[in-house]
A protein has these predicted regions:
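Strongly charged
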Residues: 1-5, 9, 16-21, 27-85
Length: 85
């Protein structure tokens, strides 16, 4: 699954274009490396996501097939680290 679509489906970005913008700006990394928004993500991948106010590192546990409700999104990833900036 493309990283921009994954971020949208897991409610980690409001829109797919916002997710793509975050990836392009370097705010989203996979395994510590900068990627393109077309990067295919698989289970077990480690994502580093930087927001203006916080940074989180997550491991993808399962790939969603469609948009996930906010209350259920954390069953698809595991938070490794989270810190406020």
């Amino acid at each position: 699954m493309r990283i921009d679509l994954l971020l949208k489906y897991l409610c980690l970005a409001k829109t797919r274009s916002e997710a793509a913008k975050g990836v392009r700006s370097g705010g989203v990394r996979v395994e510590g490396k900068a990627v393109k928004s077309s990067k295919e993500i698989k289970t077990g991948d480690i994502l580093h996501i930087r927001y203006p106010e916080r940074e989180i590192v997550i491991e993808i546990v399962e790939l969603p097939r469609k948009q996930v409700p906010r209350k259920k999104r954390e069953q698809f990833y595991r938070i490794i680290r989270e810190r406020n900036l």
